[in-house]
């Protein structure tokens, strides 16, 4: 009997599950000590509110992870300011007005779509998982109301596999849906007989295990455009349902799972290093230090006591102001502490602070909280900017991987979905069939470009200083190129800079106006001179009289 699709996928899932097992103990430990409610290794954990932070005494690691996620959100994909822009591969075409306006319009529509969707609620969770577990995953799906709908996956709930290029192209996700959700999403005819019986009996909120697999559709028929022959196959099925029944079999034009990794070792599928993994040892040590400090204080304030045997089974009190009566016996000290504890916690507190600093450094807290932790009022603005840029450069490699594995696929898929729904204006004719590229202009992306920005500003200032002594030095500066380069590296809107062809037209018009004004001024000067001559009295001993006499003298000589 031929193997069914569900049986084949279950076999592939078993292989992915076996491959992931070596990562799970590390992830569980990270979850226990840093992010207790950020994992889901069992589908039965859904809607469970049991306490999970029993191993955390000092929450420095948890707060550092929160700072990293918030800092990456505000520094990379902040909804409060533009963080990406579209461009053409040819830089000269970016100076063409219609192209510049079309790209700006498309970018604005994409930003509006992102703001309307739940993308900015999902990204902080993705960044948090990425920083603590070195791997994150988020689905970007089509939605009838918001165009796109994102769904972040908790660590432990998904299984990944790489393509030959080393990028993730396969994802299996095991999760739970209620009977009501299954019927609403897939229809009563597509669910198993067990779910049908639950529905008919009114058991709507019982949880059912579901598997969703997305993988390359290698055997697709490229001549067909139906959902089953798209580049990526999507299959939903019940884990415990019938072997020959699927909930839904469809496909995607683009891989819908964004799965960035903080750092990858060789051919590994999952991330191998991240701030959470670096900080795990200090986080565990910090819990022990805090426990010892509390024990030290507890022994000093509530010490163990020794007493004579005569007090056995007698009333003894340790309450403030209370009295315990004993008979003083020679050679005995009476009711007293077993040993005296000197609660000198200075060294312990210093060790705790040092451990906290290590944790914060691992999570780049000093980078994101730099302006708060440093007194910048007494520092020049240039020094503050330079210090901030230097700190942000530390995240350069992480940003490049995040762009490649998350943000680029996110923008490509969102753009393609808008094209399929005819939500974009028609492009100019010169852009027909031209690919687009994405440039990032977030705070952190601009920090990577700030070195070139500072160099450009320094060069222009240097030429300006030379021009004060030698004005011809300005001939060496291409002002138009300097303005375009500065605006490009600053990330300002393209509509702020006037296209080059409009600049040339304005300059020609200005030159023509100046030429006309000069000709008019010369004509007015000539007319004014003629008028002055015509109004002058020749009888006066003036220049005209002298001229008349000279003319008459010449006439007499000629006669």
Question: Which residues make up each language-model segment?
Answer:
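Charged, amphipathic alpha-helical segments
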Residues: 113-122, 209-221, 465-469
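Structured, contiguous alpha/beta core segments that scaffold functional sites
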Residues: 14, 142-320
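Short, Φ-rich (hydrophobic/aromatic) sequence segments
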Residues: 60-76, 110, 114, 121-131, ...
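Alpha-helix initiation and N-capping motif
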Residues: 103, 107, 120-123, 135, ...
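Short amphipathic alpha-helical segments
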Residues: 98, 102, 106, 118, ...
């Amino acid at each position: 009997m031929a193997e069914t699709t569900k049986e084949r996928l279950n076999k592939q899932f078993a292989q992915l599950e076996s491959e992931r097992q070596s990562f799970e103990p590390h992830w569980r430990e990270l979850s226990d000590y840093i992010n207790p409610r950020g994992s889901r290794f069992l589908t039965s954990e859904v809607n469970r509110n049991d306490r999970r932070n029993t191993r955390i005494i000092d929450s420095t690691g948890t707060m550092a992870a929160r700072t990293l996620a918030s800092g990456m959100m505000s520094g990379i994909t902040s909804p409060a300011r533009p963080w990406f822009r579209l461009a053409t591969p040819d830089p000269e075409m970016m100076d063409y007005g219609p192209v510049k306006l079309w790209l700006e319009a498309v970018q604005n529509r994409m930003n509006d779509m992102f703001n309307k969707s739940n993308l900015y609620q999902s990204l902080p969770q993705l960044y948090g998982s990425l920083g603590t577990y070195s791997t994150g995953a988020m689905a970007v799906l089509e939605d009838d109301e918001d165009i796109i709908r994102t769904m972040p996956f908790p660590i432990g709930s998904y299984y990944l596999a790489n393509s030959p290029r080393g990028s993730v192209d396969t994802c299996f996700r095991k999760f739970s849906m209620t009977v009501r959700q299954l019927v609403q999403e897939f229809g009563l005819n597509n669910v198993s007989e067990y779910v049908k019986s639950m529905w008919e009996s009114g058991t709507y909120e019982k949880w059912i295990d579901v598997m969703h697999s997305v993988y390359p559709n290698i055997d697709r028929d490229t001549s067909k455009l139906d959902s089953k022959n798209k580049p990526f196959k999507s299959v939903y099925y019940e884990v415990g349902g019938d072997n020959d029944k699927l909930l839904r079999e469809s496909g995607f034009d683009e891989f819908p799972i964004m799965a960035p990794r903080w750092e990858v070792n060789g051919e590994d599928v999952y991330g191998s290093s991240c701030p959470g993994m670096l900080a795990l040892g200090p986080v565990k040590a910090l819990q022990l230090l805090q426990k010892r400090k509390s024990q030290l204080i507890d022994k000093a304030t509530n010490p163990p006591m020794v007493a004579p045997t005569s007090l056995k089974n007698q009333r003894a009190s340790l309450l403030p102001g209370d009295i315990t009566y004993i008979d003083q016996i020679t050679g005995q000290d009476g009711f007293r502490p077993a040993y005296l504890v000197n609660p000198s916690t200075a060294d312990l507190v210093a060790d705790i602070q040092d451990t906290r600093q290590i944790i914060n450094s691992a999570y780049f807290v000093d980078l994101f909280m730099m302006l708060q932790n440093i007194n910048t009022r007494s520092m020049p603005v240039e020094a503050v900017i330079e210090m901030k840029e230097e700190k942000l450069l530390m995240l350069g490699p992480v940003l490049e991987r995040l762009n490649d594995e998350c943000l680029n696929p996110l923008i490509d898929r969102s753009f393609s979905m808008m094209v399929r729904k005819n939500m974009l204006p028609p492009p100019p004719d010169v852009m027909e069939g031209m690919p687009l590229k994405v440039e990032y202009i977030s705070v952190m992306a601009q920090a990577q470009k700030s070195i070139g920005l500072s160099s450009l500003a320094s060069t222009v200032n240097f030429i300006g200083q030379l021009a004060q002594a030698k004005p011809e030095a300005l001939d060496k500066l291409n002002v138009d190129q300097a303005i375009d380069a500065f605006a490009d590296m600053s990330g300002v809107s393209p509509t702020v800079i006037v296209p080059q062809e409009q600049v040339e037209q304005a300059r020609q018009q200005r030159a023509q106006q100046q030429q006309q004004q000069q000709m008019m001024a010369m004509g007015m000067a000539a007319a004014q001179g003629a008028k002055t001559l015509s109004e002058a009295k020749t009888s006066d001993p003036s220049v005209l009289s002298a001229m008349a006499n000279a003319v008459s003298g010449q006439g007499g000589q000629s006669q």
